């Protein structure tokens, strides 16, 4: 496969998961931040819940977050030290990142991460909970807990929760090189 690469399997994510359980109020917390505008939920329909640790930003109201390099740590960033340890050890130059939760039986349809921000970034997933199918272009894999993967987010990609529990994955971007 050229658009999905398994980096490692069997990573112990139990401490990361425990911190998620300890701070359930962090899910969706970026919606309550001052001076933060969320994309129109009628235009961007999804059943995914988000816990952003480093989110994109804009400097002007008419700017698209996909076309800026602005990265802002959310208040939840400080609480989730276990995932930060993982990132600092393995990918210390990470940029935007967060946890995504997909309910049982749900899917995220094929989409491309658009904007200049993504042109020089690699995107990774670390699976925290549940089993899911991930598809990129015409390739697909089944992802289990503790799997770290890279994928080409510049072509259509999406996911289906195959498990009997909410799928949680940690998504993060790293500049090329």
What are these regions (language model features)?
Residues 159-163:
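Asparagine-centered strand-capping/turn motif at beta-strand->loop junctions
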Residues 142-156:
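Conserved metal-binding segment of the jelly-roll/cupin
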Residues 1-90:
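Non-heme Fe(II)/2-oxoglutarate
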Residues 92-94, 103-105, 119-123, 129-131:
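Short connector loops at helix/strand junctions that flank enzyme active sites
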Residues 99-118:
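Conserved short histidine dyad/triad with adjacent acidic residue
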Residues 98, 125, 158:
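Short, surface-exposed charged micro-motifs
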Residues 122-127, 148-150, 164-177:
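A short hydrophobic beta-strand segment most commonly corresponding to one strand
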Residues 109, 125-144:
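A short beta-strand-loop-beta hairpin characteristic of the jelly-roll/cupin
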């Amino acid at each position: 496969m050229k658009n999905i690469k398994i980096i490692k399997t069997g990573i112990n994510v139990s401490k990361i998961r425990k911190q998620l359980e300890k701070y359930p109020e962090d899910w969706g917390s970026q919606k309550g931040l001052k001076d933060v505008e969320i994309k129109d939920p009628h235009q961007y329909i999804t059943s995914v819940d988000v816990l952003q640790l480093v989110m994109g930003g804009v400097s002007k109201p008419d700017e698209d977050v996909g076309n800026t390099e602005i990265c802002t740590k959310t208040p939840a960033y400080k609480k989730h030290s276990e995932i930060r340890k993982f990132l600092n050890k393995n990918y210390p130059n990470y940029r935007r990142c967060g946890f995504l939760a997909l309910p049982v039986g749900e899917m995220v349809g094929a989409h491309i991460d658009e904007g200049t921000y993504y042109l020089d970034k690699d995107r990774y997933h670390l699976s925290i909970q549940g089993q899911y199918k991930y598809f990129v272009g015409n390739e697909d894999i089944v992802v289990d807990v503790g799997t770290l993967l890279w994928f080409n987010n510049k072509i259509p990609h999406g996911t289906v929760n195959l498990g009997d529990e909410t799928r949680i994955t940690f998504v993060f971007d790293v500049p090329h090189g």
